[in-house]
Amino acid sequence: MRTLLIFSITVVLMSSIVVSQLIQPENEIRTYIENSVPYIGTEIPRMDRIDGTGIKIAVIDTGVDFNHPDLFGWGPDGKVIGGHNFIEENQLPMDTNGHGTKVAGIIAADGNTLGVAHKAKILAYKVSEDGEGVSSELIRKAIEKAIEDKADIINISLGVNKTNSKIDSAVNHAWDNGIFVVTAAGNDGPELKTIGSPGRNFESITVGATYNNMTSSLIAILEIDETQYTVIPMVGSSKTQEPIIEKIVFGGFGKNSDLENLDVKDAILIVERGSDIEGELLFFSIKEMNAAKAGAKALIVYNNQPGIFLGELIHEFSEPGYVPQIPVVSIDREEGLEIIKTIEKKGLGIMNLFYNPDFIAHFSSRGPVSPFYIKPDIVAPGAYINTTQINSSYNFTSGTSFAAPHVSGAAALLLQKNPELQNDEIKSLLMTTVQPVSNAYGQEFSLHESGSGRLDISNAYKAKLIINPTNFVINLSPNQLSIEKQLEIKLIEGELGKINVKFEGPEFIEFTHNIKNNNLLMELNIIGEKFGEHEGKIFINHEKIQYTIPVLIHYTEGSISAYEENEKIFFEINHPDKWSSAKITVTNSKNGNTYSITATPDKKTSLEIYENGEYWIDAKIRVDENISNAFDTIKITSLPEEMKLTNIPEKQIILVILAIIIIGTAGLFIRK
């Protein structure tokens, strides 16, 4: 009896371990027009009566208020022609939160406001009641239902802070079924590596957020002794008529008592956020009034905790009739303390606040998500967007949730104009015809922040070239100093004629090209020894349209190369210094399945593969106590059709085998 009990406990324990590994926990997902719609160029297609007619766009969100006059009607004759309520079965997907209604309005409002594709129809899939959280399983079900309902485009303006294989797999399924999928990047910026699923999905077009029009796109610069600082204008701040060039003065917390014995007349005052008295509410508006009263020309508020923040001067607790008198910006704690620490040594500060709509919103999530592809793909207006709200109202709102529907609407216009377009062709037209986006100092944002650039529907609509791929990630090393790449150019109409090609990037990268059979053949050569990650752009000019193809270059000290033989991938590692080991991670680009293996210099390293596809290879080469990265890609096409007995990943198979061994061993003891 005792041995039988031990055997039973063993079976239960091992089964629970295996099951826990096989079941992926549910992840809580957070939901992340007025001027923005014409700003991105909708007037050009509207002149041709291209308005989204005949296109069905699935909105996976909090539902849609189909009683709103701009989104009126449920059923075949309404704006919202179908959908599903995954929160309350047998109920219509009516929005009681507002998030989904805002998204749908940007896409297809048709009334007092006009969405990007105002004659398109909406499929509403309600996966959240309050906009705060929803399980990944509901997102997956909604995507599958959109496929079943034959949506043309899916808009997903919500996501998680990490990879979610359920959502990514469903997005891939939709993409493979010819449905164009648009995802929001998320609102966890300005830090890098903040894009989660489904925004990190390789196939979907991932959208970050910019400002939009000239009245709500205030940005700021702060320079001290030629050092440039990142500052954010507070909401309600006034702009400067001209740059303010004055001394910097530290004013404690910005109280009257902090300033009464200081000479702050005409100065740029810097103060700390909050108060030195616990529980005291020292609003930014109070700090601004005190600074202006003391004669300061501008105010900087540095954070009282790590990171930067967006402050508001005008709020419900502001004094009646309060109007800010001087420009006010926020800065992160580290930079604020740096300014204060060296304030006596530094010269004059230069502050300027001005309008720039093509500026990445501070909240917009950034990449990278992988060394092998670029995210976000594109940016669009997502700050201070005036759109539809529940209860027949309108409201200003901000977030990448509201940048994504601009792109969904744009895709609808292109698809109406040319119904034969494939997903990668729509993606190309949107991503290669963008406008550049630059920071407050006139420097273009990095690819990890802005992707290809800001959506320009008028250019995408007029474009005659479909160029693929839409960007390149190139891996070079001293072992491989040059690489050849090819751009395929497809004409939508007419003849190719004359095109001009140029490359802008680091001076130590040499670029040559020629055109053959409507293909652009290129060679990039490294002529310097600057290891690291570098960015460039290829520009193609054709019939007054400029096409932009970003290039991300990894120039690494070590290298890894891969080749296929007998259904295995073999790896060769090179490094100028003596290396002891390398951890190699191989990822199937289509399904995300990942495999790892360790290589050493004294043995040949290989990995068995079971399906065709493109594989991304990431090697972390150990040299003494340092780690050196190296990358490669390989495309496998020679394998027979996949005949896998199970879809259980390798780790879980090992656990199952281990369970069988333990159970078998326990059984032997029982028999004895």
Task: Locate each region found by the language model.
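Surface-exposed binding patches on compact interaction domains or structured appendages
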Residues: A440, N468-P469, E493-L521, S580-G592
